[in-house]
Curated annotation (Swiss-Prot):
Role, per record: May be involved in the digestion of phagocytosed particles in the lysosome, participation in an inflammatory protease cascade, and trimming of peptides for antigen presentation.
Alphabetic keyword roster: Carboxypeptidase, Glycoprotein, Hydrolase, Protease, Signal, Zymogen
Name of the protein in its database record: Probable serine carboxypeptidase CPVL
Any GO MF annotation of the entry: serine-type carboxypeptidase activity
Signal peptide coordinates: 1-22
Annotated active site: S204, D388, H448
Similarity comment text for this entry: Belongs to the peptidase S10 family.
Tissue-level expression: Expressed in macrophages but not in other leukocytes. Abundantly expressed in heart and kidney. Also expressed in spleen, leukocytes, and placenta.
Encoding gene, per UniProt annotation: CPVL
Keyword Ligase: no
EC code(s) of this entry: 3.4.16.-
């Protein structure tokens, strides 16, 4: 099936011509009210499901015509809590190649409060927004071989919204509950995909969301009539276990030359105090310390990191500021014709400030028990960009070494292997460490926003993992 076509698919794709807020939210911005024009009305699909008018709802969710939007896709809102009128926005792209068989991949952005429209337009969706607000095709879109489902999560993120403060998530249980409701509805609207392999993926703060929803699916599948065909998860530069990551910051920043000896000692002292609060479950006190070190959200002053490094960007240690083109999508989403095409009307596009407020105490809590359960039962990919600071590869490995799961001993003994895409490549794509169905990947030349920095390597990685193609280089 897919296997027989794989070398052809890879060859075709690879030969295509080449082209402050919250712990991880400085990349995400709110969209001002749209300019004058017809933005249409928001499309709520839950009433169509409940009325048995699924085909009608599906037809209405088809994304309308817009210059550059040349790939079939579907978008709309799914109501996940009627009491508070809480709704999650999704945008779904069936795979360009064999969509009837292709795995369905849920993508969740970090933040907390980062819109998955960032992943769509900046990282691996089919389109890239240009400076003049037009679209061009991405060179290595994940939608080539995978059916990609982008959801603005949690409620209050991006176009997702609620009418009541009680509708905001305060922990990962809330996040998972709402996502699960949305997924069940999604597969009711698109039943032809319910038996396809399903993967949950995401990056950064979604290192919490991904295990949370995967664990809930794992728990409910045995007792629910409607099952989600979960096959595995993939987490990029994931903030799954804050204590392990925070404990390694000072030494890592010193080793890459961003702190001197004196600054390292101060950073280490603050991180130690933060960890002490975490162990005592003083969540807000731990958040305060971390905020002063890295973000400065709670005060009007720059963070300690910003003061001593002179940089606002901790996503790639070769860059001091975020690339300008990572924000083009924000303005694009304010255009009335775009809003009409994706069925959001005049709904506010939120920057996640409120989401972060309600998840503040969640920020420093770990999802390691859930992640361990998933690692014991499913395929798992944990990947890092070599140039990331905030969730550096060394800090992820620090966390993995402290985990106890069925493959932990095999993982600790596993040899790190060089990974190249093609045998003839002079450049090394990255490094692989594998234990059974667990894969750890470090990609060279990439930072926190990995598919943006290294689109081809990210594309090859996700396809090798999901399609089980191994890590040997292709001949050619």
């Amino acid at each position: 099936m897919v296997g027989a076509m794989w070398k052809v698919i890879v060859s075709l794709v690879l030969l295509m011509p080449g082209p402050c807020d919250g712990l991880f939210r400085s990349l995400y911005r709110s969209v001002s009210m749209p300019p004058k024009g017809d933005s249409g009305q928001p499309l709520f699909l839950t009433p169509y499901i409940e009325a048995g008018k699924i085909q009608k709802g599906r037809e209405l969710s088809l994304v309308g015509p817009f210059p550059g939007l040349n790939m079939k896709s579907y978008a709309g809102f799914l109501t996940v809590n009627k009491t508070y009128n809480s709704n999650l926005f999704f945008w779904f792209f069936p795979a360009q190649i064999q969509p009837e068989d292709a795995p369905v991949v849920l993508w969740l952005q970090g933040g907390p409060g980062g819109s998955s429209m960032f992943g769509l337009f900046v990282e691996h969706g089919p389109y890239v927004v240009t400076s003049n607000m037009t679209l061009r095709d991405r060179d290595f879109p994940w939608t080539t071989t995978l059916s990609m489902l982008y959801i603005d999560n949690p409620v209050g993120t991006g176009f997702s919204f609620t009418d009541d403060t009680h509708g905001y998530a305060v922990n990962e249980d809330d996040v998972a509950r709402d996502l699960y409701s949305a997924l069940i509805q999604f597969f009711q609207i698109f039943p032809e995909y319910k038996n396809n392999d399903f993967y949950v993926t995401g990056e950064s703060y979604a290192g919490k969301y991904v295990p949370a929803i995967a664990h809930l699916i794992h728990s409910l599948n045995p007792v629910r009539e409607v099952k989600i065909n979960l096959n595995g998860i993939a987490i990029g530069d994931g903030y799954s276990d804050p204590e392990s990551i925070i404990g390694g910051y000072a030494e890592f920043l010193y080793q890459i030359g961003l702190l001197d000896e004196k600054q390292k000692k101060y950073f280490q002292k603050q991180c130690h105090e933060c960890i002490e609060h975490i162990r005592k479950q003083n969540w807000f006190e731990a958040f305060e310390i971390l905020d002063k070190l890295l973000d400065g959200d709670l005060t009007s002053d720059p963070s300690y990191f910003q003061n001593v490094t002179g940089c606002s960007n901790y996503y790639n240690f070769l860059r001091c500021t975020e690339p300008e083109d990572q924000l083009y999508y924000v303005k694009f989403l304010s255009l009335p014709e775009v809003r009409q095409a994706i069925h959001v009307g005049n709904q506010t596009f939120n920057d996640g400030t409120i989401v972060e407020k309600y998840l503040r105490e969640d920020t420093v809590q770990s999802v390691k028990p859930w992640l361990t359960e998933i690692m014991n039962n499913y395929k798992v990919l944990i990947y890092n960009g070599q140039l990331d600071i905030i969730v550096a590869a060394a800090l992820t490995e620090r966390s993995l070494m402290g985990m106890d799961w069925k493959g932990s001993q095999e993982y600790k003994k596993a040899e790190k292997k060089v990974w190249k895409i093609f045998k003839s490549d002079s450049e090394v794509a990255g490094y692989i460490r594998q234990a059974g169905d667990f894969h750890q990947v470090i990609i060279r030349g990439g930072g926190h926003i990995l598919p943006y920095d290294q689109p081809l390597r990210a594309f090859d990685m996700i396809n090798r993992f999901i399609y089980g193609k191994g890590w040997d280089p292709y001949v050619g």
